[in-house]
């Protein structure tokens, strides 16, 4: 017995042809492009993206040059020239008329103006030094992907002089002994980053650990919130100054404000996700709520924020970018803070219980 025929199926729309992927046209590379080809580095791309975003925000925060601003600048310049010309005229008249009081007052005013100009020049020089450090990091990034020879050693020796390392420093001697004529710029800079730079980074880490511990203990034992905020602000500024001095940067008023702003912007860019990830990794497993008081928990939070501030200050003051796992992690400082609070707070509570 034959099977019954299936009924006919009518489709509302005609069948569409299968869409084939569109292939790109062939691209031929010349010999020069093949020799200068480098594989993509995800860490370097992330650093470049972070620097690009930071530059965009800094450009957005800078006031735009307008016609009124130019007119005000020209007016101030003309006023300064007029004041100088009038002062010279007063000095000449006072000398001819033997008016010693007017001559003394004019001389005192001139000394004050010279002191002000000197302060402005000094601040500009320190601010320029801070900007130059960012340019040195860009040069270091270029050398870390370069296969040339000759520029890496001179660059690293310049960094050593800026850091105040003499030729007799053990780390610098080990680096010089490890160099060979066949090393390219990338290998020379990597050796410097592994042998010389850690000597400065370890000092900065020790300062961050000490300041973070002091902030945590102060918050944990102090009953006054206003005193806590003033103390934390003062210690954080001291920490930034100390880290900058370790890396050979002398901060002035404006350069200190700029560095502090860059640090805060860097923290804002990273967001709270990194802080939550680092702090919350083993927060619940250690059951800190049962072991430490609420004030101690607040102290840990303040200490971690101080440590994060110090890490970002290190990143902005270092002449070299981070390589691999060299960047300090909040987890290292977290364990130190928890251990110090556990050892300190029970000692303070035992006499009260007795």
Swiss-Prot record:
Query: Major location, coarse class?
Result: membrane
Keywords, sorted A to Z: Cell inner membrane, Cell membrane, Membrane, Transmembrane, Transmembrane helix
One Gene Ontology CC term in the entry: plasma membrane
Q: Cite the InterPro entries for this sequence.
A: DUF697 (IPR021147), UPF0283 (IPR006507)
- Please name the Pfam families in this protein's record: DUF697
User: Does the keyword field hold Lyase?
Assistant: no
Which topology term describes how it sits in the membrane?
A: Multi-pass membrane protein
Would you indicate the residue range of the signal peptide? none
Membrane found in the keyword field? yes
Localization annotation: Cell inner membrane
- Where does the chain cross the membrane? 71-91, 101-121, 214-234
Report the PANTHER family cross-referenced here: UPF0283 MEMBRANE PROTEIN YCJF
Q: What family does the entry list?
A: Belongs to the UPF0283 family.
Q: What is this protein called?
A: UPF0283 membrane protein YE2117
Q: Which organism is it from?
A: Yersinia enterocolitica serotype O:8 / biotype 1B (strain NCTC 13174 / 8081)
């Amino acid at each position: 017995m034959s099977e019954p025929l299936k009924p006919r199926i009518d489709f509302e729309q005609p069948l569409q042809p299968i869409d084939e992927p569109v292939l790109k046209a062939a691209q031929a590379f010349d010999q020069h492009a093949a020799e200068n080809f480098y594989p993509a580095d995800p860490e370097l791309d992330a650093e470049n993206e972070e620097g690009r975003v930071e530059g965009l925000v800094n450009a957005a925060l800078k006031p735009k040059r307008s016609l009124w601003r130019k007119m005000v600048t020209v007016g101030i310049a003309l006023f300064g020239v007029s004041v100088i010309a009038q002062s010279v005229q007063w000095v000449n008249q006072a000398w001819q008329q033997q008016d010693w009081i007017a001559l003394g007052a004019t001389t005192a005013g001139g000394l004050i103006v010279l002191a002000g100009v000197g302060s402005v020049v000094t601040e500009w020089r320190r601010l320029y030094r801070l900007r130059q450090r960012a340019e040195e990091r860009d040069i270091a990034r270029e050398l870390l992907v370069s296969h040339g020879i000759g520029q890496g050693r001179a660059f690293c020796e310049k960094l050593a002089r800026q850091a105040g390392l003499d030729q007799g420093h053990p780390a610098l001697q080990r680096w010089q002994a490890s160099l060979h004529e066949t090393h390219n710029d990338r290998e020379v800079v990597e050796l410097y980053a592994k042998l010389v730079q850690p000597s400065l980074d370890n000092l900065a880490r020790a300062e961050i650990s000490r300041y973070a511990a002091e902030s945590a203990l102060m918050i944990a034992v102090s009953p006054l919130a206003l005193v806590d905020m003033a103390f934390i602000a003062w210690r954080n500024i001291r920490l930034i100054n100390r880290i900058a001095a370790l890396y050979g940067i002398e901060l002035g008023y404006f350069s200190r404000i700029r560095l502090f702003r860059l640090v805060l912007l860097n923290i804002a860019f990273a967001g709270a996700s990194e802080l939550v990830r680092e702090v919350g990794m083993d927060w619940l497993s250690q059951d800190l709520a049962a072991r430490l008081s609420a004030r101690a928990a607040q102290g840990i939070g303040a200490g971690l924020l101080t440590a994060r501030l110090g890490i970002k200050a290190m990143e902005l003051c270092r002449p070299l970018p981070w390589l691999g796992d060299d960047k300090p992690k909040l987890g290292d400082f977290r364990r130190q803070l928890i251990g110090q609070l556990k050892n300190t707070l029970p000692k303070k509570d035992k006499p009260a219980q007795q």
